[in-house]
Every structure is written in structure tokens, then in C-alpha cells.
Amino acid sequence: MTNEAYDNTTTLDPRIAQRLKHDDKGLVAAVIQQFDTKEVLMVGYMNDEAIRRTLTTGRVTFWSRSRQEYWRKGDTSGHAQYVKSFALDCDGDAILVEVDQVGAACHTGKRSCFEEGGQLPVVVGHRTKEQEGQR
């Protein structure tokens, strides 16, 4: 869908809203991914209004759970996220937003919020011989 479908709206399109499965605070998790490299940059939360703003402005808006307010990524840091695509998962309880990220995505100054936390020890799984070649 293009932005023209949402111009001059003050509420989220009901056709989109009905597909969402919100948590008990009215939020949906949003995975933010760099559009060209597919690097996962961060996870934020959106309510219907943050989703509407994101769909209509071309910039990512989140709902801050700690500050209880809307924040548009990059307004204070300059590290803006320009929307390239917006998709719901099959259950409607998660969003994937592909963006063109300017600078760091993480509040720590790192490109990705997953750099700071680091890798955890994990047993690496392997496909069986029968599964090789399957997607």
C-alpha cells in the first residue's frame, strides 16, 4: 500500500486494526530491519496511533513504554528511520518494518540494539541429511 491510502486520516484504518493482536497494554511488537542488508536493528512497540503515524509519514513512530509517550526515531538524535516496507506476521501480533536507518538505531550509539547485549552460549542445531536443500 502507498501512503496515499492513508492521507488525511486521524485513526488507523479499521481493515488494518482488525488484523492486529495487541497485548494487554494495546501494543504490538515491531521488529525494525535495515531494508538492504536485512540486519535486525531493534525491537520497539507500537499502538494503533503509532502504526497510523508510521504508515502515513514514512518515518517510524513508537510508543515508549517507559515514558508513556510517542517518539519518532531520530527527532532528537538525528538517527532517523525511513520506512521502506511494513508487514504483519501471520498472527497479527508482530510487525516487521524495513527501514533505511540513518546512523545508530540503538540509544547506546550502536548500529543495532543487538550488538550491546552480545551473543549467548547456545547449542547449534543442524539439519538432518533428509532436510538438506529444504527451505
UniProtKB/Swiss-Prot annotation:
It is found in: Cytoplasm. It comes from Bifidobacterium adolescentis (strain ATCC 15703 / DSM 20083 / NCTC 11814 / E194a). It is an enzyme of class 3 (hydrolase). This is Phosphoribosyl-AMP cyclohydrolase. Pathway: Amino-acid biosynthesis; L-histidine biosynthesis; L-histidine from 5-phospho-alpha-D-ribose 1-diphosphate: step 3/9. NCBIfam families: PRK00051.1. Its cofactor is Mg(2+); Zn(2+). It holds the Pfam family PRA-CH. Mg(2+) binds at residues 89, 91, 93. Binds 1 Mg(2+) ion per subunit. Binds 1 zinc ion per subunit. Belongs to the PRA-CH family. It catalyses: 1-(5-phospho-beta-D-ribosyl)-5'-AMP + H2O = 1-(5-phospho-beta-D-ribosyl)-5-[(5-phospho-beta-D-ribosylamino)methylideneamino]imidazole-4-carboxamide. One of its GO terms (biological process) is L-histidine biosynthetic process. The keyword Cytoplasm applies. Its EC number is 3.5.4.19. PANTHER family: HISTIDINE BIOSYNTHESIS BIFUNCTIONAL PROTEIN, PHOSPHORIBOSYL-AMP CYCLOHYDROLASE. Homodimer. GO terms for molecular function: magnesium ion binding; phosphoribosyl-AMP cyclohydrolase activity; zinc ion binding. GO terms for cellular component: cytoplasm. Zn(2+) binds at residues 90, 106, 113. Keywords: Amino-acid biosynthesis, Cytoplasm, Histidine biosynthesis, Hydrolase, Magnesium, Metal-binding, Zinc. Catalyzes the hydrolysis of the adenine ring of phosphoribosyl-AMP. InterPro entries: PRA-CH, PRib_AMP_CycHydrolase_dom, PRib_AMP_CycHydrolase_sf.
